[in-house]
């Protein structure tokens, strides 16, 4: 999906962090916690990206018995495909994640065609059907702030399955590090909120109600210049 790549450099101060936390809390709200053993399913579906912490968490889910099989899904996306000045990954996200997970081969299924979130679900669904793997309940894992968008995508692209979402911990403050900068995280939070509205309008995901205070924080961050991850062909304020 196209994105607006020419956003101006933005400063992250206390106010920007406060707005971003509003978006973070909204995006991550559907995620299950790890109490009482955490969610369980027929598979764990790990959505590919540039963040290998997702692979590490998928391995943790498998080791604690969340599911007997982990499906790693993803070819290359914009970033892992070399977009925005990033180094192109030599292998698919699914392959990189599987290796990073350290899981035994019999616990892993690779889906290496998907290039977006909807395809993560539709391609994994097709692969499981081809392999005769019955899926009635499943656990999706991805970057924490993708909880709402992942579940909204699953509702359209893999209906008939009871989905839970679980991701690595740390919260808003613990997400960023030398490789994952605050300004980039905020741009992703902004872009994913826009996508909830835009993709539902296009029939790519289920509708999600966005409360007024979340829309207000989003608009403030757009005005502050955190627009690098917005869909360029869609309205900046889609509500």
Give the location of each predicted region.
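A conserved mid-domain beta-alpha-beta active-site/ligand-binding segment of alpha/beta enzyme cores
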Residues: 176-236
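A structural signal for short, hydrophobic/glycine-enriched beta-strand patches
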Residues: 1-189, 239
């Amino acid at each position: 999906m196209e994105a607006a790549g020419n956003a101006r450099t933005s400063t992250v101060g206390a106010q920007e962090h406060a707005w971003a936390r509003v978006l973070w809390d909204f995006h991550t709200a559907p995620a299950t916690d790890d109490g009482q053993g955490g969610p369980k399913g027929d598979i764990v579906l790990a959505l590919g990206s540039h963040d290998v912490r997702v692979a590490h968490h998928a391995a943790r889910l498998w080791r604690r018995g969340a599911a007997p099989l982990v499906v790693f899904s993803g070819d290359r996306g914009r970033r892992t495909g070399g977009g925005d000045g990033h180094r192109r990954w030599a292998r698919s996200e699914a392959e990189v994640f599987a290796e990073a997970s350290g899981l035994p081969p019999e616990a892993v299924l690779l889906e290496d065609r998907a290039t977006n979130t909807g395809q993560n679900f539709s391609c994994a669904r097709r692969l499981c059907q081809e392999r005769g793997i019955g899926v009635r309940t499943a656990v999706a894992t991805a970057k924490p702030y993708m909880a709402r968008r992942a579940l909204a995508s699953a509702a359209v692209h893999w209906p008939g399955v009871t989905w839970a979402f679980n991701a690595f911990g740390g919260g808003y403050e613990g997400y960023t590090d030398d490789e994952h900068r605050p300004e980039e995280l905020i741009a992703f939070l902004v872009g994913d909120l826009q996508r909830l509205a835009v993709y539902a309008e296009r029939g790519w995901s289920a509708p999600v109600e966005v409360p007024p205070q979340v829309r207000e924080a989003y608009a403030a961050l757009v005005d502050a210049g955190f627009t690098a991850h917005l869909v360029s062909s869609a309205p900046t304020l889609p509500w």
